[in-house]
Amino acid sequence: MYVAVKGGETAILNSQKLLAEERRGDPAVPELSLAQIRQQLRLAVARVMTEGSLYDPDLAALALKQAAGDTVEAIFLLRAHRTTLPRLGYSVPLDTAGMTVLRRISATFKDLPGGQILGPTYDYTQRLLDFDLTFDPAGQAPSPAAAERAETAQDAAHGPTPSVVDLLDQEGLVETHPIPEGDPAPHDLTREPLRFPADRATRLQNLARGDEGFLLAMGYSTQRGYTHSHPFVGEIRFGTVDVVLAPEELDFPLSIGEIELTECQMVNQFAGSKTEPPQFTRGYGLAFGHSERKAMAMSLVDRALRAPELGEAVQSPAQMQEFVLSHSDNLEASGFVQHLKLPHYVDFQSELDLVRKMRAAQAQQTPKADAP
């Protein structure tokens, strides 16, 4: 039972003023611009866009600024704004094979067509605090080193490269996913509620906007023995992909821009079943921006959730689609947990009365000890 109450209007307005002051901080300190957030906190921006289901770096930066860095609150703001936007059409499926690659690695093949492209990554840093970053560059001209780094990043983009999983496909060693007859439109979770059992397309939608921390924990559990799969990173790629529309009025597709994406294809050994030969199976992850950890966790959980269709026993939480999909959304989780701090006066009073009555009844039933 939820009890709706109306608080004092003046108190609420004052609370909102205090919130704005706390968000701004010391007025003597220069305020963050959206460009600074977008450029220098790009990984946070990518997470907000992914879990907010809206690709717009400027709006994601605004949401982070308004939420004072609270990622889940920023995701809430972006999703709320998304509901106000008109839907003008649908793009054709993104062609990640045609990605302009900034980073591309494989843990399964050392020498692969197009080569390993390290790109920007924390993987080879020492995880030591860089105190050079404490320098306040306000009013300073860009250093030659900074200009050189920017030029290097610009030159680092590589053209389309073949998918690593295609190498296994050439030998027939990895499962294929043919397009279903009629190519039915996938269930749209942004317009229709989640229903069980959910097909893979619906599960992938849920995981794509699911909480990164939750998916990371679920993916981690699959590596600690709670499933029987041994994953390998077939390929992780990060770069830009064209968004293409095919308007009915035109006889040709039209590129309307490009977006940054991270894609992960995880391969797992599969011993085979009564209908399928031994082969490698796939787990898939896709996220906006540079979001490798999210894409990897998503691909691990995707593969775990495929246990029933592959004839595997469903024994662990990561394999139970109702458990995973019902608890992956951080807005639902945050809302349900945080509603506990709202007034529950009537609920608590009823339980308080009940506890008092139970204690009184227990006192009457307990025999009194004989006096000495």
Q: What is the role of each PLM region?
A:
Residues 3, 27, 60, 67, ...:
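Aromatic-enriched hydrophobic runs in primary sequence
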Residues 76, 95, 101, 106-109, ...:
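A ubiquitous, low-specificity "background" feature that marks scattered single residues
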Residues 93-154:
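Helix-turn-helix/homeodomain-like alpha-helical modules used for DNA recognition
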Residues 55, 85, 112-116, 175:
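Short secondary-structure junctions and interdomain/linker hinges
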Residues 34-58, 63-89, 93:
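Hydrophobic alpha-helical segments, chiefly the membrane-spanning helices
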